[in-house]
Amino acid sequence: MSEKVEKEIGEQITKLDLSEYRSIELSKLSKENIGQKIRTFGWVANVRSQSTITFIELYAHYRTVKCVYQKKMHLTMCTSMTVYGTVSKNFGKKDAHEFEIQVEGVEIYNGAIAPSFPLNEDSSVNAILTNGHLGLRTKKRQLFLKARGHLLKIIRDFYFEGEYTEVTPPTMVQTQVEGGSTLFKLDYYGEDAYLTQSSQLYLETVVPASHRAYCIMPSYRAEKSRTRRHLSEYTHVEAEMADIDLDGLISSIEALVSYSMRRFYEEMKSDILSVFPEFEFHKVPRTPFKRIKYSEAIELLKSKGYKKEDNTDFELGDDIPDAAERYLVEVVGDGCPVFLTHFLVGHKPFYMRKDENDKGLTESTDLLFPGIGEILGGSMRQDTYEDLIEGFRRENINIDPYYWYLDMARFGPCKHGGYGLGFERFLMGLMRYESVDEATLYPRKVSRCQP
């Protein structure tokens, strides 16, 4: 800003009786304020100057308001400023604003115009994430922020209505849940400790007291996977329930997913369409969802001629990769979520309960979501001391750090089960993001630990 313009702006403010201007948050302004003198604060989202007039789109709290200043000003995106003016009818014919502010004075915060903004709506995802602190000023990332917060609230509402107790288990642990090779190790006052892979074991200890418990906590996996759906740190939605069987567990998952999808799309629809006018909303699935056993899925893939990456047939014992999972969603679920159930004992962790009719299988399930694949894993939990000891031995795990977990099988055990939902994957699916990075505030993965 030139010294002359800066001086003119300053002089204009001094001529105003600021006590006449009512302070109102920008997001709370409406056409009900027409005729009122107001003061409001925000950031410049867009600016256009003509010879003697400046049109400013001022942004704050997910809301943009049109401001008209009868002076030519040089402003840049993200400049923070306070506007004094009168709310009036919108006289523009080419925009959808219900009202506008006829500006009578402005105060640039600290008198500093922001530098030229390095991003725009066409910037790549990588560029936006590399400049993540500034990327949040773009419309797409602002929508992400609102969508993320909204989905978290919806999930918590589901659990609150279902009388689940929320807890916050520790994230520094000396146990493992999903295999030692994916642990982040740290020095805990001279002892080995790890960042948690899952809060499941601690959640199980809460169940005898609360009957139903959940947590929404960070989990960590030191997996060097470079895929569009893997993170090294992610938000883990986990729940455990007492006195339940596998069918009941799956029904509870269906209820969570259907409830969340329905409310999310109902309440976020206008926000999503304002940024993505052509957005295709997923069908909210009817319950029960389609189910297919792991062994049946292997046979289906073989019968359909769906090959592995090395162009050989799938065989019992093979992992089903994400591309094949997405294929199963289309073929089995007709584009709606599908439960993949009854995985082999040797392919699942020590804590999963064996199927009573086939001890080679677990009472387990993964939920496959359209466009992504697996977003949730769950199972009935082992509840006998002997079966837990067998599981520890099978996986060559030292039982000493698990003394407290083994006590659960000695002091009033019950039939119980639970699951863990990858929150970012769920949001990625709902928003049709190409990568889980887009569903994450500041992604942490093999290739990224900044900003």
Curated annotation (Swiss-Prot):
InterPro entries: Aa-tRNA-synt_II, aa-tRNA-synth_II, aa-tRNA-synth_II/BPL/LPL, Asn-tRNA-ligase, Asp/Asn-tRNA-synth_IIb, NA-bd_OB-fold. This is Probable asparagine--tRNA ligase, cytoplasmic. It is found in: Cytoplasm. PANTHER family: ASPARAGINE--TRNA LIGASE, CYTOPLASMIC, ASPARTYL/LYSYL-TRNA SYNTHETASE. GO terms for cellular component: cytoplasm. The keyword Nucleotide-binding applies. Disulfide bonds: none annotated. Keywords: Aminoacyl-tRNA synthetase, ATP-binding, Cytoplasm, Ligase, Nucleotide-binding, Protein biosynthesis. The lineage of its organism: Eukaryota, Fungi, Fungi incertae sedis, Microsporidia, Unikaryonidae.
